[in-house]
């Protein structure tokens, strides 16, 4: 994958995260403040905990930082997969967000 393809796929992922947060805020009592600055999205929960998602263009990776730890993802044909075999990006983001929000949440593409 070249830089242009990476940025296109990565930007689509960040937009999907923001759209998922808007949907969750509209449909549930969860309150997720989604803040975008350049190639980074920060999700702030009502308990003030945060999840940070940012693009690592030189590595063609997306990094996710949550209370449970840090995760790195590379695009593999159709999805973003953890570089250490820990699963798919949106499944892990949903798990981390649910833990930090204290209620079940689903973020997806």
Curated annotation (Swiss-Prot):
Cross-referenced Pfam families: Frataxin_Cyay (PF01491)
Disulfide bonds listed in the record: none
One GO CC term on file: cytosol
GO biological process terms held by the UniProt record: iron-sulfur cluster assembly
SUPFAM superfamilies to which the protein is assigned, alphabetical: Frataxin/Nqo15-like
Entry keywords, A to Z: Iron, Metal-binding
NCBIfam families, alphabetized: FeS_CyaY
Annotated PANTHER family: FRATAXIN (PTHR16821), FRATAXIN, MITOCHONDRIAL (PTHR16821:SF2)
Record family assignment: Belongs to the frataxin family.
Protein name: Iron-sulfur cluster assembly protein CyaY
Gene (name only): cyaY
């Amino acid at each position: 994958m070249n830089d242009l393809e990476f940025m296109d796929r990565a930007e689509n992922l960040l937009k999907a995260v923001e759209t998922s947060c808007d949907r969750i805020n509209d449909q549930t009592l969860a309150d997720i403040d989604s803040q975008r600055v350049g190639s980074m999205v920060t999700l702030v929960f009502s308990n003030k905990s945060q999840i940070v998602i940012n693009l690592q263009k030189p590595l063609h990776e997306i990094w996710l930082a949550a209370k449970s730890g840090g995760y790195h993802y590379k695009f593999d044909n159709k999805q973003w997969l953890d570089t250490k075999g820990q699963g798919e990006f949106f499944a892990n983001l949903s798990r981390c967000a649910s833990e930090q929000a204290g209620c079940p949440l689903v973020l997806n593409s």
